[in-house]
Regions:
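FAD-site-proximal beta/loop scaffold in flavoenzymes
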Residues: 1-12, 105-108, 113-187
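Active-site flanking residues adjacent to catalytic metal/cofactor-binding acidic residues
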Residues: 26, 33, 64, 161-162
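Hydrophobic alpha-helical segments that mediate membrane insertion or helix-helix packing
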Residues: 35-39, 186
Length: 188
């Protein structure tokens, strides 16, 4: 991030400079939302007075999510609140937009091409391949569907936690595959 700002500071060509100041975060889950917010905070607040050849407001932070909302695993209320916070902070939130191609200096979606040297991939991951060997029910992301004690449906002696597990809370909402959830499940 800082290197991108340094490159922009040293670039005299305004068009070339803009690609150093474009930051594209692909994936609107917890990691992508946090990353886009952090980049925006650094770009628009922390680096505000640091450069002479451009304004930090020249930076563009894009958050691209393929589904119809960011934080799709959370409630609509939380998703809407997070999107408002990000857009108020200057992040360009793009939902229902799929990334088709990433090259050295651009990101192409099904709607446009963005010149950017800075791309952060935070969109999805595959569940552990060992889950397939368990011969248990899985969700569309390949995660094992688990009971409240984190055991798999077919064998109460096999437990799956973290991003390999599809664990639903008391409101039937699947918990995200992030470290705090995995730590709590591991302690359980």
């Amino acid at each position: 991030l800082l290197r991108a700002f340094e490159k922009a500071e040293n670039e005299k060509n305004i068009e070339k400079r803009s690609k150093y100041l474009n930051f594209v975060v692909v994936g609107g889950g917890p990691t992508g939302v946090e990353m886009a917010g952090s980049i925006a905070e650094i770009a628009y607040r922390n680096m505000k007075e640091e450069f002479r050849n451009f304004k930090s407001s020249d930076a563009n932070v894009y958050l691209i999510e393929a589904t119809d909302k960011i934080l799709p695993m959370y409630s609509d209320r939380l998703s809407t609140k997070a999107e408002k916070y990000l857009t108020d902070f200057g992040v360009k939130v793009r939902t229902n937009e799929k990334v088709i191609k990433i090259e050295n200096d651009s990101v192409t979606t099904d709607k446009e091409s963005i010149q950017a040297d800075n791309v952060i991939w935070a969109a999805g991951n595959e569940a552990s391949p060992i889950i397939k060997k368990l011969n248990t029910k899985t969700d569309n992301e390949g995660r094992a569907i688990v009971d409240p004690d984190c055991s798999i449906k077919d064998d109460g002696n096999v437990f799956v936690i973290g991003d390999a597990a599809n664990y639903k809370d008391k409101n039937n909402i699947t918990l995200p595959g992030i470290a705090p959830v995995a730590i709590q499940q591991g302690k359980y």
